[in-house]
């Protein structure tokens, strides 16, 4: 079950996706799908220019994905003081990024 968090703007992922560069849309979809496989408590917070994935409604985010022209800027947060920024290219292998995201998700209590 996909849970959505409304930030008052009632913006859906589909609305967000339409505004992203078509080159990065498939990669955003893959990242989104992966994040939801991490657990039933993953919450999606769709913002104007990015999508944040959080663990439960406590909204402890673990990944912030902001589409660029031909890449996605990812901020991966393992703890409140530890954020890693990664530029994910459209042809880049996702395995390493998925491992970082999983580690960040698992580190949130």
Where are these regions (language model features)?
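Charge-dense, helix-prone N-terminal extensions
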Residues: 1-109
